[in-house]
Amino acid sequence: MSVSRKIIYNVTASSISKVITTVIALVNIGLITRYLGQEMFGNYVVALAFFLLFTALGDFGIYQTTTREISRPGAKEDEIVNNAIGLRITISLAVIAISPIFIWLSSYSNELKIALGIVLFAFFFASFTQLLIGLFQKRLLMDRVALVEMFGKVLQLALVAIGVKMDLGFNFIVGTLLVTMFFNFIVIFWLAKKFVRFKPSFDIAYWKKFLYQSFPIGLSVFVSFIYFKADSIILSWLKPSADVGLYGAAYKMIENLSFFPGMIVGLTMPIISYNIFSNRKKFETIVNKN
């Protein structure tokens, strides 16, 4: 199959999966909003915002840089990926070690503080899943990732439905995110073992060169978080949870529908990286088509 056809296939498969996932997510949000009510849904929105904050803090551009580097001609894939994993472990553990201090010093309710602890561990699994996705992007196998994410959403919906039916409470609903992220990580890791022999590396000299390239990307990710999601956290400091819930319900609708541009860029980035130096004409063609 030609590269163009592979891209079209991946975009089509990912789009179909994402449409199904979006429908599931909207049903999920509907169940959660009705079950929790406006005030507790506000706490749920805050918990999700902190999940994205932890993700932004621990990003450092590692995923994007890894995907770019392994996609270049003659790349030492095992070395790049294993050093990226070692770096991700170090940064993620630092975020997990430091964040609880700020959580417990905050003025949030104890129930919400527990929820923030849950999403902190969800971030840990999500960050590694994101890193491994680069291996599939390089090989234009994002249909597999899309399928795993779709089943993850189905699992979360089933757990939320059980939680609502049995009245298991707010933190059980938040916990479904942790279970989903763990499920996604386990399956993606199992699939990725076919591509790389995983053995985390802690080469400080390599990390310095890597971070020199990745940190500006990580900074842009954090700025994007501030632009798109920091408003929910700031609102939770200024207004009651009920107001945050009202704002968050409307915002979730937009969030679930604005995925196509980022998906297309993600699918084509490995090919762009491969051709930027080796085949300039093809590189320009792909960029123009994007």
Question: Which residues make up each language-model segment?
Answer:
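Interhelical loop/hinge segments that connect adjacent transmembrane helices in multipass membrane
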Residues: 1-3, 7, 143, 171, ...
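Membrane-water interface segments that mark the loop-to-transmembrane alpha-helix transition
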Residues: 9-21, 47, 56-103, 114-115, ...
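Helix-loop junctions and terminal segments of transmembrane helices
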Residues: 29, 58-75, 137-138, 254, ...
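Alpha-helical transmembrane segments of multi-pass membrane proteins
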Residues: 53, 57, 89, 93, ...
